[in-house]
């Protein structure tokens, strides 16, 4: 990124944005050159990608963690596999999508879950807005955990309702063996596991692992 030495050697109290210049804009995203001040007083530039759809919403999107619960079955995490042109291959992801105008994060999560998987669920919890790839864009999402009653008649044979141009395969994996299953699937050619899914699986593994023992100090 470009830098410019400050005229005043006194460092600013905090880093801040000085200007944002639009370089290119499409239907869904725009590309900007962001000029900002660093802690030493230098002016720097950053190449930034932004969505065009936020318009005052609490976040751009929702990412859904769907927990499928059925009698006499292990809990499963419902994922979606779809082709992602920027990756040039398939990705295994949580159901997700943009929040529509006037829509709450919870409503968006339930809508996206039903559209992409066919399942209907209940909200367990909703996170505050969290960033997705802050080194590249300002995109934010709510992470929404949804429980699915797999014994409900409407969830026995769910039928996805994909939008135009959406081609999604639903994959349910056991929660207690999620990381192992992801590693096996990730070894397939042209399939990449989304970082949010993998981080969730790692967290499950660490949470269920033997607690770390405090080492004895040697004097």
Curated annotation (Swiss-Prot):
Phosphorylation at Thr-45 is required for homodimer stability; dephosphorylation results in destabilization of the homodimer. Dephosphorylation at Thr-45 promotes the ATP-synthesis activity. The modification Phosphoserine is found at residue 10. Signal peptide: none annotated. One of its GO terms (cellular component) is nucleus. Its main location: nucleus. It is found in: Nucleus. Mg(2+) 3 binds at residues 112, 116, 166. Mg(2+) 1 binds at residues 96, 116. A motif (Nudix box) lies at residues 97-118. Substrate binds at residues 28, 46-47, 84, 98, 133. The modification Phosphothreonine is found at residue 45. There is a cross-link at residue 42 (Glycyl lysine isopeptide (Lys-Gly) (interchain with G-Cter in SUMO2)). One of its GO terms (biological process) is ribose phosphate metabolic process. Its cofactor is Mg(2+). It catalyses: D-ribose 5-phosphate + ATP + H(+) = ADP-D-ribose + diphosphate; ADP-D-ribose + H2O = D-ribose 5-phosphate + AMP + 2 H(+); 8-oxo-dGDP + H2O = 8-oxo-dGMP + phosphate + H(+). Its EC number is 3.6.1.13, 3.6.1.58, 2.7.7.96. It comes from the Eukaryota. Belongs to the Nudix hydrolase family. Enzyme that can either act as an ADP-sugar pyrophosphatase in absence of diphosphate or catalyze the synthesis of ATP in presence of diphosphate. In absence of diphosphate, hydrolyzes with similar activities various modified nucleoside diphosphates such as ADP-ribose, ADP-mannose, ADP-glucose, 8-oxo-GDP and 8-oxo-dGDP. Can also hydrolyze other nucleotide sugars with low activity. In presence of diphosphate, mediates the synthesis of ATP in the nucleus by catalyzing the conversion of ADP-ribose to ATP and ribose 5-phosphate. Nuclear ATP synthesis takes place when dephosphorylated at Thr-45. This is ADP-sugar pyrophosphatase.
């Amino acid at each position: 990124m470009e830098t410019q030495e400050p005229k005043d050697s006194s460092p600013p109290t905090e880093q801040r944005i000085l200007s944002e210049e639009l370089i290119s804009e499409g239907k869904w995203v725009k590309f900007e050159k962001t000029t900002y001040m660093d802690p030493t007083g230098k002016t720097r530039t950053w190449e930034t990608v932004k969505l065009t759809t936020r318009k005052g919403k609490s976040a751009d999107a929702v990412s859904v963690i769907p927990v499928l619960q059925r009698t006499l079955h292990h809990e499963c995490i419902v994922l979606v596999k779809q082709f992602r042109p920027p990756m040039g291959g398939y990705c295994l992801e949580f159901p997700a999508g943009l929040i529509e105008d006037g829509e709450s994060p919870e409503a968006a999560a339930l809508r996206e879950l039903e559209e992409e998987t066919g399942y209907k669920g209940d909200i367990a919890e909703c996170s505050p807005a969290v960033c997705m790839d802050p080194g590249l864009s300002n995109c934010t999402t709510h992470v929404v955990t949804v429980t699915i009653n797999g014994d409900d008649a409407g969830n026995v044979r769910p039928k996805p309702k994909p939008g135009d141009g959406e081609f999604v395969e639903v994959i349910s994996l056991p929660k207690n063996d999620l990381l192992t299953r992801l590693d096996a699937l990730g070894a397939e050619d042209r399939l990449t596991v989304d970082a949010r899914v993998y981080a969730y699986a790692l967290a499950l593994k660490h949470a269920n692992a033997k607690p770390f023992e405090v080492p004895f100090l040697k004097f």
